[in-house]
A protein has these predicted regions:
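Conserved sequence signature across two-component system core domains
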Residues: 7-8, 37-39, 54
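CheY-like receiver
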Residues: 45, 51-114
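Two-component/phosphorelay signaling modules centered on CheY-like receiver
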Residues: 11-35, 74
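Generic detector of well-ordered alpha-helical packing
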Residues: 9-10, 58
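Non-catalytic signal-transmission and effector/linker regions of two-component phosphorelay proteins
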Residues: 1-5, 15-18
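Helix N-cap/capping motif at the beta->alpha junctions
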Residues: 36-42, 65
Length: 114
């Protein structure tokens, strides 16, 4: 089972990503456990943050996804980080925190599947 966390302040975006992940799971026979968080603070307050993959929105109030990624990297070098953003100009900054890549919003199955 692959444990996936989604941190995004927009419910619609979280729902689109969950739909893409569900489709991936069904098409590949891969079991996924997906948890969602509506802001960085809720993620940081969670008791169980042992994820294999984290999808982070870059543009969130209070703490950006980039700031959250920096905090995550202080204690976890292994989790795969993927940024989901409509701010392409910031997406490349994700590589400074060891992000695997980024997905441009709105999330389309084609871009997710690649």
């Amino acid at each position: 089972m692959i444990r996936i966390g989604i941190v995004d302040d927009e419910k619609q975006e979280r729902d689109q990503l969950k739909q893409a992940l569900a489709r991936f799971s069904a098409e590949n026979g891969t079991e996924l456990n997906v948890q969602e968080f509506d802001c960085a603070a809720v993620y940081l307050a969670a008791q169980d943050r042992d994820f294999d993959i984290l999808y982070l929105d870059i543009d969130m109030p209070q703490m950006s996804g980039m700031e959250l990624a920096e905090k995550i990297r202080e204690t976890n070098q292994d989790v795969i980080l993927i940024f989901c953003t409509n701010l392409q100009q910031f997406a490349l900054n994700g590589y400074s925190v060891g992000a695997l890549g980024f997905i441009v919003k709105p999330i389309q199955w084609y871009s997710f599947h690649m």
